[in-house]
Structure formats: structure tokens, C-alpha cells
Amino acid sequence: MSRICDLTGKRAMVGNNVSHAMNKTKRKFSVNLIKKRFYLPEEDRWITLRVAASTIKTINKNGISAVLKKAQTEGFIK
């Protein structure tokens, strides 16, 4: 399973490890994914999603319904 957020499409970024001598080696910054259940009051059911921690903060701020609707318009959910 790829490490991609179900709602925002966030995926790993590539960067550098930089030593004190400024030597650079490639590395990967992975997404902080969490498997979480959300309750949809409109449909009276629970859904399980793999979302980034930053997405959970967005859901707490805007609500699950608004975030799901935005994810559908951006094409992350069918």
C-alpha cells in the first residue's frame, strides 16, 4: 500500500541529509499517516481512512463533510 493521504493526496517528499561539513545525501520525508475512523452524521455510518496528521487538524477545523466534499472536487475520492 502506498503511503498517500486518502483525502489530500499528500505523499513523500525528497530532500537531503546535510552533515556539519555540508555533505548532502538524498533522503525521503515520509507522510505522518494515521488510520482513523470518522463518523458521518448525514449517512449515519463510520468510515475508516488513512489520513495525514495535518489532515486530521483540517477535519477538526472544517468538519469531515466539508473536507470530503473538497476531496471529491479535487479528484482524490470517486
UniProtKB/Swiss-Prot annotation:
SUPFAM superfamilies: L28p-like. GO terms for biological process: translation. GO terms for cellular component: ribonucleoprotein complex; ribosome. Keywords: Ribonucleoprotein, Ribosomal protein. InterPro entries: Ribosomal_bL28, Ribosomal_bL28/bL31-like_sf, Ribosomal_bL28_bact-type, Ribosomal_bL28_sf. One of its GO terms (molecular function) is structural constituent of ribosome. Pfam families: Ribosomal_L28 (PF00830). Belongs to the bacterial ribosomal protein bL28 family. NCBIfam families: L28 (TIGR00009). This is Large ribosomal subunit protein bL28. It comes from Flavobacterium psychrophilum (strain ATCC 49511 / DSM 21280 / CIP 103535 / JIP02/86). The lineage of its organism: Bacteria, Pseudomonadati, Bacteroidota, Flavobacteriia, Flavobacteriales.
